[in-house]
């Protein structure tokens, strides 16, 4: 439920509320003689105020209150988060901005209670909270849209899966996470049906768990992305790729070590014969590469080239 108001020609307000009921049932199986039923009600109220001070300066402030009720064992959460952004227009083509925002993510029931031959439940999993900072520049000139940004992220109790290679099992746990980096991207439109995009990010993601007690490298430092899209009449097709280099594998109880880059590619095409129908073909791993996409001490290789053909009808 959401309501938008145009207060005047310089101010806009958004107010909204959200509700969702979650339920998780662990049914009887050969490995378990009991059944379990978990549920909780998720509530949220939020607001946003956008204020244009003049032709060059605009500020946006948003707030959200999130809470749960009726959780098992009274394991309820309550969080207030806020965000703000200031945009300054340099000229008709250039803007600079600065933003800061808090984040809040609750653990899912699957992460807390999910159990299988390889998954270990963690009912004590805590929600993750964080704060994100970003300053940047945007430029729209002709058919090009440029963006450059410097960012920093701090997350407390980041929810992450940890793999135990000895027992061949994994469990979701909390660890602290931080990342600082710079990114540059460009979107290119043309007079014809083609459009293009590319981007590069240099970053330094790190994590600290109770097991290690020190900041250790994670994921990869260099990411290159790119894509091309063809759109004409009822057909839209796109080819995209993501290359992650300067990667590390990060074991749960040992120091990270270097691992090879990976290159992921996807082709997607949608044909819409009418307003209610879509025929979609998605092909993953177009180059049929065998890349280890895991960032833990175990190896998990990308699925060979595969496709999904689907039909969607909107009522």
Q: Could you say what each language-model-derived stretch is?
A:
Residues 1-5, 45-51, 84-88, 135-139, ...:
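Residues on the lipid-exposed face of transmembrane beta-strands in outer-membrane beta-barrel proteins
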Residues 9-13, 55-59, 80, 92-96, ...:
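Outer-envelope beta-barrel architecture signal
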Residues 53-56, 151-154, 173-252, 272-278, ...:
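Gram-negative outer-membrane beta-barrel transporters
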């Amino acid at each position: 439920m959401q309501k938008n108001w145009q207060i005047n020609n310089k101010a806009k307000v958004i107010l909204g509320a959200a509700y969702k009921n979650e339920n998780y049932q662990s049914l009887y199986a050969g490995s378990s003689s009991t059944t379990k039923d978990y549920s909780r009600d998720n509530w949220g109220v939020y607001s946003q105020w956008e204020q244009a001070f003049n032709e060059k300066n605009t500020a946006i402030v948003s707030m959200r209150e999130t809470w749960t009720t009726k959780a098992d064992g009274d394991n309820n959460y309550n969080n207030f988060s806020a965000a703000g952004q200031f945009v300054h227009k340099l000229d008709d083509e250039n803007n600079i901005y600065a933003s800061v925002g808090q984040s809040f993510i609750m653990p899912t029931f699957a992460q807390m209670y999910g159990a299988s031959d390889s998954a270990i439940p963690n009912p004590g999993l805590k929600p993750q909270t964080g704060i994100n900072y970003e300053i940047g520049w945007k430029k729209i000139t002709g058919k090009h849209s440029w963006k450059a940004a410097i960012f920093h992220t701090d997350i407390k109790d980041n929810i992450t899966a940890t793999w135990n290679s000895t027992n061949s099992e994994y469990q979701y746990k909390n660890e602290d996470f931080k990342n600082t980096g710079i990114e540059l991207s460009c979107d290119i439109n043309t007079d014809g049906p083609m459009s293009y995009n590319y981007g590069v990010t240099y970053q330094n993601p790190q994590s600290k768990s109770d097991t290690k007690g020190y900041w250790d490298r994670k994921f990869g430092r260099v990411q290159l992305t790119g894509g091309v899209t063809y759109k004409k009449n009822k057909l839209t097709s796109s080819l995209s790729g993501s290359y992650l280099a300067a990667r590390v594998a990060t074991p749960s109880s040992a120091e990270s070590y270097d691992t090879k880059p990976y290159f992921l590619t996807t082709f997607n095409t949608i044909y819409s014969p009418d307003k209610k129908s879509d025929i979609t073909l998605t092909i993953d791993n177009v180059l049929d590469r065998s890349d280890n996409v895991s960032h833990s001490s175990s190896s998990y290789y990308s699925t060979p080239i595969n496709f999904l053909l689907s039909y969607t009808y909107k009522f």
